[in-house]
Structure formats: C-alpha cells, structure tokens
Amino acid sequence: MGTLPARRHIPPWVKVPEDLKDPEVFQVQTRLLKAIFGPDGSRIPYIEQVSKAMLELKALESSDLTEVVVYGSYLYKLRTKWMLQSMAEWHRQRQERGMLKLAEAMNALELGPWMK
C-alpha cells in the first residue's frame, strides 16, 4: 500500500491523553490493506470518523504483516478492532475463493504447471 503520511492531528473525538493510553493492537496481512483501507489509505479518515477511533498503521519489518493500532475510548476501540478484523477475514476468504476458482479454471483448460 505504500508509506502513509505521518499523522498531523488527533481527531476531535479522541480525548487526550486518556484515549491514547492502552491502544488495541492487532496484525493484518499487508496484501489486504488496500482492500480494507483503499488506495494509499484513502478510507482511513472515513473509518476513523464513523468508528470514533484513531488508527495508526505500522509495517513490520521482515514480515508480510502490518500492525494496526486503534486508539479511542474502550468500547470504540473494541468495536473498531472487531470490525477491521472481520473485514480482513472477509477479504482474505474472498481472495482465497478467487484463487480456487482460478485453479479450477486452469485445470479445466488443462494448462500445465509451467503456465501458472
């Protein structure tokens, strides 16, 4: 997805400093980020506004995972984490189904492994 610009401001619905303590953290496969957050993270401001949370993405070195950090009040953090994990799982399953259909189509055409 590329490098996201550094955050310049904290959204007005995030209370400083109490909402910045003890964030919810989880990891998402980097290849799913564009599907969840849009090209170059264009959907992040909308997701933050609707969920009343603040998101921060951190690429993990030597891994195909990205760490998602969710700041906000306790319930908003948990709800946002659950929503994003559900979206990631949905997109992962969707991509997996697409790969299975592609494999079936290639088998139906009897393409050899050198064509894959």
From Swiss-Prot:
Pfam families: MOEP19. SUPFAM superfamilies: Eukaryotic type KH-domain (KH-domain type I). CDD domains: FILIA_N_like. Keywords: Cytoplasm, Developmental protein, RNA-binding. Belongs to the KHDC1 family. Involved in the maintenance of embryonic stem (ES) cell pluripotency. Dispensable for self-renewal of pluripotent ES cells and establishment of germ cells. Associates with specific target mRNAs. This is Developmental pluripotency-associated 5 protein. It comes from Homo sapiens.
